[in-house]
């Protein structure tokens, strides 16, 4: 029979109607001569009651069997306010078995105790859990909001190629061998960067796309080898115009999904300020704990750890926690410092005028008073500090700062703090390649402040780029593009690309800019990460239908896998044993 309703649809107004529902058996409960079945489908749960004279209909039925039931809607005596159908139940007339199920490797419940490996191996069962299905529904809603907002502003959705050209800049490419063109490879896109820029050269005014991207990099909880991003570009636009557009969309997402109305413009924090105060270019500003430079306080110190910091051009930096941290908490924070290549984490505790801690006995009276004034200490505090090169000590204290917030629950999980990080360095030093490389990509316009000497003053060169940050996570990045051939040539030379390499890898791209290009700017943000944060998921894998594990393996189908020799032979490829 045809399904008349879903399992989340019926209520008290449907009493006495004959209905047909279809779904999975969630639970079977016998109470005397009566049996109750919780029937589940994608939409919800409805209770089915099987009377004494109908017990033969449920012989051999088990959880996760798929059935069709027909019966009459009746009012429940014992109501369940936790579900929309909790006022009614179905008095069964007939049950039809659609399909049986083997015993599942775990119970289909939200809070089931099962390893992630098992969940990923049986992802199709894991996806039956309401928690994971809700994540997929929210993801679909966010995608819908994005499309509506961009289309309302006259953006055109254009699909760009998945098979492209490998370039030496950026992360490792996933390569795809070509059978028809022997010994050649396509590269799966790390982003549609070059294609979307060419769309602007082609005369498109506003472009957007929800697109799958691929990066062959080390994985963690918020990374996957394939991921989805919102990609956009605008002709004749400044950085501010792009930021305004993205703000509008992200605020709409929060309003419709979380009911949060961001009325104020997002703050814009320069990169160097973010590093100085928070030790990170993606600061979590839900809590204070700002990093302070303490060089002046310890200018003439007798503390052995700090005594030669000036000669070695090092910085003494620290944070102040308005609590007395325990020995166990300090051990955890010291381990965090060690993960950032610092052997220890100095500390000093203050309580009602008394000092203690690893450096307390060596503090002079002047240093004590200066620390109290610097951190505005009242009754009690723990100061965490160390010495090192400015960038490294800032990075370490940024990690310690976040760990303190985690230990002391300083960050409200339902508080969302969005901000822009601007004025990024144009370059970053690559230890692996022993040269400066483009921090974002070699097509990002230098900031007007750096336009005259960006190829010679690399350490101070600033890019016209920007990141959107939420609660310590980078949501996305964008920038103004280089459209002047002279500036582009200077940029290529600055990152060590010779003419032959430029022509080989980018000739097809830069040639387009010889034919009249508008100034343009764009942005892209990771949809997977946005959904992860909106749902408070611990891992990005919980918001992707069929994810890979931390080793890039699909536990369900065992991809990547070996292929037959004849397949490799067709591609002129041999494997190295």
From Swiss-Prot:
Catalyzed reactions: tRNA(Asp) + L-aspartate + ATP = L-aspartyl-tRNA(Asp) + AMP + diphosphate
Binding site for ATP: 215-217, 224, 474, 526-529
Coiled coil: none
Superkingdom field: Bacteria
Keywords attached to this entry: Aminoacyl-tRNA synthetase, ATP-binding, Cytoplasm, Ligase, Nucleotide-binding, Protein biosynthesis
Stored PANTHER family: ASPARTATE--TRNA LIGASE, MITOCHONDRIAL (PTHR22594:SF5), ASPARTYL/LYSYL-TRNA SYNTHETASE (PTHR22594)
Name assigned to this protein: Aspartate--tRNA ligase
Native source organism of the sequence: Mesoplasma florum (strain ATCC 33453 / NBRC 100688 / NCTC 11704 / L1) (Acholeplasma florum)
């Amino acid at each position: 029979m045809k399904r008349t309703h879903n399992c989340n649809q019926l209520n008290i107004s449907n009493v006495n109607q004959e209905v047909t529902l279809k779904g999975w058996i969630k639970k079977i409960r016998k109470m005397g001569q009566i049996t109750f079945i919780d029937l589940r489908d994608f939409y919800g749960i409805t209770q089915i009651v099987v009377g004494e004279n109908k017990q033969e209909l449920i012989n051999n039925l088990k959880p996760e069997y798929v059935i069709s039931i027909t019966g009459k809607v009746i009012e429940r005596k014992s109501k369940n306010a936790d579900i929309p159908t909790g006022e009614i139940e179905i008095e069964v007339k007939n049950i039809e078995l659609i399909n049986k199920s083997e015993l599942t490797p775990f119970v289909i419940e939200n809070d089931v105790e099962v390893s992630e490996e098992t969940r990923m191996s049986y992802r199709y069962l894991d996806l039956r859990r309401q928690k994971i299905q809700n994540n997929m529904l929210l993801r679909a809603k966010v995608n819908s909001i994005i499309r509506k907002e961009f289309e309302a502003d006259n953006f055109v959705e254009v699909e760009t190629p998945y098979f492209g050209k490998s370039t030496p800049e950026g992360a490792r490419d996933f390569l795809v061998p070509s059978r028809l063109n022997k010994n050649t490879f396509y590269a799966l896109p790390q982003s549609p960067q070059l294609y979307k820029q060419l769309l602007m050269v082609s005369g498109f005014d506003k472009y957007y796309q929800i697109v799958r991207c691929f990066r062959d990099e080390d994985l963690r909880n918020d990374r996957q080898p394939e991921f989805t991003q919102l990609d956009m570009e605008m002709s004749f636009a400044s950085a501010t115009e792009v930021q305004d557009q993205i703000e509008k969309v992200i605020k709409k997402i929060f309003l419709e999904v979380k009911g949060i109305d961001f009325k104020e413009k997002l703050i814009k924090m320069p990169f160097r300020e973010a590093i100085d105060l928070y030790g990170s270019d993606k600061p979590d500003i839900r809590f204070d704990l700002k990093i302070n430079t303490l060089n002046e306080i310890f200018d003439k110190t007798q503390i052995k750890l700090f005594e030669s910091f000036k000669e070695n051009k090092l910085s003494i930096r620290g944070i102040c926690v308005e609590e007395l941290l325990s020995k166990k908490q300090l051990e955890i924070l010291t381990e965090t410092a060690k993960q950032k290549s610092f052997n220890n984490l100095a500390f000093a505790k203050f309580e009602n005028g008394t000092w203690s801690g690893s450096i307390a006995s060596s503090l002079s009276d002047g240093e004590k008073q200066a620390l109290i004034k610097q951190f505005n200490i009242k009754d009690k505090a723990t100061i965490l500090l160390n010495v090192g090169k400015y960038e490294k000590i800032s990075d370490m204290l940024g990690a310690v700062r976040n760990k303190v917030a985690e230990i002391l629950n300083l960050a409200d999980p339902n508080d969302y703090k969005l901000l822009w990080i601007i004025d990024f360095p144009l370059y970053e030093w690559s230890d692996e390649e022993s040269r400066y490389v483009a921090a974002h990509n070699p097509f990002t316009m230098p900031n007007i402040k750096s336009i005259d000497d960006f190829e010679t003053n690399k350490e101070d060169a600033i890019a016209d780029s920007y990141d959107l940050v939420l609660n310590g996570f980078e949501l996305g990045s964008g920038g103004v593009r280089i459209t002047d051939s002279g500036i582009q040539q200077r940029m290529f030379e600055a990152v060590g690309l010779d003419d032959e390499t430029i022509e080989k890898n980018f000739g097809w791209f830069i040639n387009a800019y010889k034919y009249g290009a508008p100034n343009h700017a764009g942005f892209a943000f990771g949809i997977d990460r946005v959904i992860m944060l909106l749902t408070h998921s611990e891992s990005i894998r919980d918001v992707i239908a069929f994810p890979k594990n931390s080793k890039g393996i699909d536990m369900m189908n065992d991809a990547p896998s070996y292929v037959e020799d004849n397949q490799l032979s067709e591609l002129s490829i041999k494997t190295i044993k």
